[in-house]
């Protein structure tokens, strides 16, 4: 089914200023710790099973960076949320990393981990697994030290604005690489808004630069504490089409089907996609 033919998910707002405002309002009830428990603690956060969703995401990222083609000086993580796992393999390839999120509570959660404050979420199992699959002999402590040292700033972002980081951003632009995990589909009222958000973040990337995009397939809602948040359902083909429309060559697109034992009632996700895309141009 093409984007033009897709019927909006039940409860989804129309693609309009009011629709985007409704999304922003719903996110004011977002609870970072509940989100982390739902998705990054067991069972979904169990990294002992190599067929689990966590190992799959980490392998996709590690294998892509291992090609040596995705490198440079600057990287921007779009819509980081309260998570850092998406940068564990990236941090050895980029010396200047910018993390971003729309919500202050998520930026605060990231700050606690970056400053090693008591009570910060423990990502050590993810760091250990990333070191294991990279096979460089690096300790997880060294991995985390490097990531903390290379994250230079945590900034507000609004992917629905033509200038997502605003004017006069301290982030070096354009970036050599963008990473984004579970952001665009989770904050877009419909596919048209998803496409525009992708267009907007693409302005932050240099021609020839790379985008690594992770997201939910065919998901319409998820829970984060008291918040029940609407998601625009996307298919693998719709992701591919959106990337091409935004001026990318799709280098790799993989999918993971969520097994029954990981369908825990915190969302209705059917699977996960990982896309590696390169912005056309020199």
From Swiss-Prot:
Positions of S-adenosyl-L-methionine binding: 35, 40, 79-80, 85, 101, 106, 158-159, 181
Gene Ontology MF annotations: phenylethanolamine N-methyltransferase activity
Binding site for octopamine: 219, 267
InterPro entries given in the database record: NNMT/PNMT/TEMT_CS (IPR025820), NNMT_TEMT_trans (IPR000940), SAM-dep_methyltransferase (IPR053384), SAM-dependent_MTases_sf (IPR029063)
Tissue distribution: Expressed in the adrenal medulla.
Pathway: Catecholamine biosynthesis; (R)-adrenaline biosynthesis; (R)-adrenaline from (R)-noradrenaline: step 1/1
Catalytic reaction equation(s): phenylethanolamine + S-adenosyl-L-methionine = N-methylphenylethanolamine + S-adenosyl-L-homocysteine + H(+); (R)-noradrenaline + S-adenosyl-L-methionine = (R)-adrenaline + S-adenosyl-L-homocysteine + H(+); (R)-normetanephrine + S-adenosyl-L-methionine = (R)-metanephrine + S-adenosyl-L-homocysteine + H(+); (R)-octopamine + S-adenosyl-L-methionine = (R)-synephrine + S-adenosyl-L-homocysteine + H(+)
Annotated EC: 2.1.1.28
Free-text activity regulation comment from the record: Inhibited by p-chloromercuribenaoate.
pH dependence (UniProt free text): Optimum pH is 8-9.
GO cellular component: cytosol
GO BP terms in the entry: epinephrine biosynthetic process; methylation
SUPFAM superfamilies: S-adenosyl-L-methionine-dependent methyltransferases
Entry keyword set: Catecholamine biosynthesis, Methyltransferase, Phosphoprotein, S-adenosyl-L-methionine, Transferase
Family as reported in the entry's similarity comment: Belongs to the class I-like SAM-binding methyltransferase superfamily. NNMT/PNMT/TEMT family.
Function comment: Catalyzes the transmethylation of nonepinephrine (noradrenaline) to form epinephrine (adrenaline), using S-adenosyl-L-methionine as the methyl donor. Other substrates include phenylethanolamine, octopamine and normetanephrine.
Name of this chain's protein: Phenylethanolamine N-methyltransferase
Taxonomy of the source species: Eukaryota, Metazoa, Chordata, Craniata, Vertebrata
Gene name in the database record: PNMT
